[in-house]
Amino acid sequence: MSALAMLLSSTTAAAHATPAACEKRLLPPSPGAAAGQNLAAKDLVQLRDFGESSVSPDGRWAALILRRADPARDDYCIGLVLVPLQGSGAARFLDIGGEPIQLRMDLRGVSDIVNGSIADDAPVWSPDGRTIAYLRRDRGVTQVWIATPQGRPRQLTRLADDARSVEWSTSTTLRIQYRPTSKALAQISREGRGGYLYDRRFWALSEARPNPPPSPFEIVTVEISGGRTVPNLAAAPDPKRSPAARLYVTIPEGGRAWTAPQQPLRYAGPSVLTVEYRGRRIACGDICGSRVSAIWAQGDTVLFLRSGNPANGGETEIYRWDLAREPSPRRILATQDALYSCALAGSKLVCGRETALHPRTLAAIDSGTGATNTLYDPNADLAGRIRNSVERLRWTDPNGISSYGDLVLPAGYRPGQRLPLVIVQYQSQGFLRGGVGDEYPIHLFAARGYAVLSITRPRPPSSDSDAPDADSYQRINITGWADRRRVQASLEAGINALVARGVADPDRIGLTGLSDGSSTVQFALINSSRIRAAAMSTCCESSASGVSVGLAYSDSLTRWGYPAPGSDNPQFWKPYSLAANAEQMQTPLLIQVSDREYRLALETYAALDAANAPVEMYVFPDEHHVKFHPEHRLAVYERNLAWFDFWLKDQPTADPGSAATMARWQALRLRSTR
């Protein structure tokens, strides 16, 4: 992966909608309620989304957090939903309110860098099934709330610092994880009175003040009856569980199953599944080697899920193994659909499920046959509104490296008709919304007459190495730009396949990307002549990248093989830096970046502009690596559609409000032919 992808990237919104208004927005509409209406950018932004779900101990219910964006208010509606898993009852809300919780990560010695993506944590059921605990954020602080299956939500904690996770220790007590940062942040504010010492605490890309170094998370145990804090009682570890086990289950009829690294000294080596049953270890061959990402056990039976990858065309598989009766596992399901957060409920697996043409639903998968049926669809009104066709394509580059993509074509496409092609990156799985970061609306492009290729990047060269640590792993990818060359070769192979089929017009190809996808755009614009227009959501690696982000990040780049700050190495940058190749750049480039990351783009934009290259850049306020604000996401969608219409279809938008934009783009057209 590129250094740009190693970056990660409090939101201020208008007054929230009332719970009653939000309930109306969140309620699933009747199937076909919008039948016959064309899909619009606003419809995609306003889809009802949920992350992980959890199943009650008795297997009768699932709980999940549902959210829906509102671009008109630049806000979100959020609700705790209870879904019946048996019978025909309707899903119902137990709580409505709160704000989205954004993901945070520690990176390069800097704590709690906000990514912009919304956390997908599931509500958690008490062991007796009487209470559900969940995280809810209000007025910028995340606390623990509880509700019963009958409703009656209430706030349990009033922590000074955000609650980060919650789990049950008994049916009446909760273990809550938090990070005490308020004192450290106050100390940094006091430091500012005399000026901040610039050091490795700075993530200068995002803000002009230091962050506290990562501090340990702490645990508090709370009684749910009155919120009283009680002594922490950590669960006793299972003495049979190896410390190296990544996944682990106990087999009720006597045994255990777990995954662990096959070669523990490798930084990113594969994990393999091991099964012990009634005192003996049972081999299951290649099926249990790598890609096992979930395990369940019931009676004498083990179920496990193998995730898709670039080499197998992204196919997800579920296997069932009756240890008392079957010599080896048997596959009960193979699918191109994406499955999320599966949990065993009786004889069924309950999973979040996405298809290429429909967003996430809650589905039940029969653990004996693999038969699947939908339990809950929060976007039933989308049925019939996406009329594009989707085909999974697989290809191999000249070096034998495999990957895949999804070809999306407009309804009524005639074989042999060459269409302008837009390529979206860099993981093609589940509902084809907008690529990684969700900025390039795949189905809207197809509905406007484009062929769209949603691609999955190949595994990096370092994935087959014995690299012992992250720095060694990255150094393999950076040396000779090995990873970028591999991704470019795969990209070219996918394009060649569509040109050979008569689908893609080779003179009208557009390329898009965020994060690692932006790195692919950057490399392709220098090393290929096939791209006629491009759009980036993050930009760009250049000789100034390290110092733009901060000292700790710059240290990492140097360890990976980048030139040290202050050193002049044009030979290193020539194959990759747009700034170093600005004089040759003629491909129109649209850059839409966040205010927390735009500094990384300044050298590249300035060099391209000075060279009279066709470039335009927008900076979105209060955003991070992934854009979060609904009104910004809508603006990004619409501008990307207009950009490629202008350059690949020669169709300026007729919107009177866009006259100034069209005049600028016409001026850029003169630059592109200089």
Where is each model-derived feature located?
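Active-site-proximal cap/loop segments of hydrolase catalytic domains
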Residues: I455-R674
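Blade-terminus and WD-like Trp-Asp/Gly-His loop motifs, strongest in beta-propeller folds
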Residues: S53-A62, D121-T131, R139, S165-L174, ...
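Cap/lid segment of the alpha/beta-hydrolase catalytic domain
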Residues: Y376-R501, L514
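Predominantly five- to eight-bladed beta-propeller fold
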Residues: A21, L26, C77-V81, L85-Q86, ...
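Multi-bladed beta-propeller domains
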Residues: H16-D49, V83-A119, R136, I146-R164, ...
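Beta-strand-rich domains and repeat architectures in extracellular enzymes and scaffolds
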Residues: N38-L80
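Asp-box/WD-like beta-propeller blade repeats and closely related beta-sheet repeat scaffolds
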Residues: R108-A119, R136-F217
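Structural motif
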Residues: R73-L80, G140-W145, A184-S189, S215-V220, ...
